[in-house]
Amino acid sequence: YILDAGLSISFDEVADRLLFWENFKKTYPNNHYKTKVDEYIKQYGAALFKGDDNTRTLWFDENKIADPEAMRAIKKVSISYSLSSPIAQKFEQLIQSNKQLWEQLPKTSGIDADYDSPEQQDIRNQRDALENKIKKNVDELLKPFDN
């Protein structure tokens, strides 16, 4: 499902697969494939909440923090009463609580950072600081999906 450092399936399909394996684990807690099932849950969870190099969940571009398709899939998980539901809910809250602040920050000039004016450097630093704060919070939240 990951090809050339990008998802070859939609975020919605990743969410469906995560929910399938979490349901399988809950329905069959003593199954013979427990290690493999746990591996699938971690992989699909990481793919949903983090994405991959060419299909990121978090974008931090001028107008948005996260990919809208990814956020719809995360919403599906958040209302599913699954094992990942609390993580998805906290992820949504984190993005939502920072969305307005991100959108209100001044935009960078788009010129190479080496040629920034002091004002543009300050704007870039503000955006970088918020991005790093959000990434740190996301990393903390997603520890259950780390390998």
Model region roles, listed by residue range:
Residues 101-111:
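Extended, charged, solvent-exposed helical/coil segments
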Residues 34-39, 61-64, 89-92:
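Short, charged, amphipathic alpha-helical segments
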Residues 130-147:
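Short, low-complexity, Pro/Ser/Thr/Gly-rich segments in the mature regions of secreted, periplasmic
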